[in-house]
């Protein structure tokens, strides 16, 4: 049985290698990077995972790169410093309009949609010992961690909390660092915006008792009045100590590709990711919604021609006017 399994694996690897060698790689890069975010967040795990899948299937070297998150990824992909990246619809829209704080006035229109990822919910986490169980419980002047500077959380969560009347001191850092600061009493709460389950939150609840602070329905409505978000529920069981479903708001995340990359390269890369959903689920549970039918969640970016070709071959109806170069 072991010999049969070994032979099957060898044959499968040989077939994958042969398929990669048979591809027309004219104009393809020799290697690539995927702009992710800080360690401890979903972007780093998800992005490094999808980089590995593309590298394996296409037979070229590639990997995830630690970055400042969606805003920086838009800049890196726009300039071509990173072939691929990950962003949310809010930062993507700001970047297209020239209001990305990394390069104010520059319209980053060379970052194209590649495939849908997942929704990023916004939630606050505090130590149980803090007594913070709701947004209204957050004391004035609280020190709140918002993730890396330029991340989706840092870009939107402070303004969201301000709209709810929360007075706070803003702190930035990687999710892992902020988790340590929370445990050391240097922070009162962390405002997370990341795909769930978030590794840093899972690690935090394994080490100490935490409160998951949800929004009230009124707070959800208030936030939706001023921000490009939708209601979201973090399902019970996402985290081990979660008391039940958690009300939240969320933004969609999309993988992006430099618009000038060869169509055939991005087509094959998209096929590698979207063609085997089970493999992406092994990368991260957030990939549950990385499925073809969510192509229409891109409401901002032009599609890369290679990605659009794959999606239109697999049930999408992406209008030619929304494809880069048309």
Where are these regions (language model features)?
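Short beta-strand-centered segments that line the small-molecule binding cleft or hinge
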Residues: 93-99, 110-116
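N-terminal (or domain-start) structured segment
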Residues: 23-94
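An extracytoplasmic/periplasmic, membrane-proximal ligand-sensing/linker region
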Residues: 29-30, 177, 184, 194, ...
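Ligand-binding clefts/hinges and TM-proximal coupling segments of bilobed small-molecule sensing domains
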Residues: 140-157, 228-299
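Extracytoplasmic
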Residues: 29, 41, 59, 69-72, ...
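Pocket-lining segment of extracytoplasmic ligand-binding domains
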Residues: 89-91, 98-104, 130, 166-261
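Short, low-complexity disordered leader/linker segments with a strong preference
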Residues: 1-29, 325-326
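Bilobed "Venus flytrap"/periplasmic-binding protein-like clamshell domains
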Residues: 31-57, 61-62, 120-184, 293, ...
């Amino acid at each position: 049985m072991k010999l049969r399994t070994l032979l099957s694996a060898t044959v499968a690897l040989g077939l994958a290698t042969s398929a990669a060698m048979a591809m027309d790689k004219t104009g393809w890069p020799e290697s690539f990077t995927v702009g992710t975010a800080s360690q401890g967040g979903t972007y780093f795990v998800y992005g490094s995972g999808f980089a590995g899948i593309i590298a394996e299937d296409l037979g070229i070297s590639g990997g995830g790169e630690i970055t400042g998150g969606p805003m920086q990824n838009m800049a890196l992909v726009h300039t071509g410093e990173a072939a691929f990246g990950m962003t949310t619809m809010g930062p993507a829209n700001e970047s297209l309009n020239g209001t990305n704080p990394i390069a104010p006035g520059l319209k980053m229109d060379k970052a194209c949609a590649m495939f849908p990822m997942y929704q990023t919910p916004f939630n606050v986490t505090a130590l149980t010992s803090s007594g913070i169980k709701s947004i209204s419980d957050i004391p004035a002047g609280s020190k709140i961690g918002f993730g890396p500077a330029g991340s989706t959380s840092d870009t939107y969560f402070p303004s969201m909390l301000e709209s709810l009347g929360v007075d706070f001191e803003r702190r930035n850092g990687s999710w892992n660092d902020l988790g340590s600061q929370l445990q050391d009493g240097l922070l009162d709460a962390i405002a997370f915006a990341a795909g769930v389950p978030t590794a840093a939150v899972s690690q935090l609840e394994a080490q100490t008792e935490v409160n998951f602070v949800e929004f009230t329905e009124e707070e959800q409505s208030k936030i939706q009045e001023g921000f490009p978000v939708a209601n979201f529920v973090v399902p019970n069981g996402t985290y081990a100590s979660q008391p039940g479903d958690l009300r939240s708001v969320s933004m969609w995340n999309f993988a992006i590709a430099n618009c000038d990359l060869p169509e055939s390269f991005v087509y094959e890369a998209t096929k590698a990711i979207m063609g085997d959903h089970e493999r992406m689920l092994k990368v991260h549970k957030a990939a549950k919604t990385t499925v073809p039918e969510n192509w229409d969640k891109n409401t901002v970016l032009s599609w890369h021609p290679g990605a659009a070709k794959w999606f239109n071959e697999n049930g999408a109806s992406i209008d030619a006017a929304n494809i880069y170069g048309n």
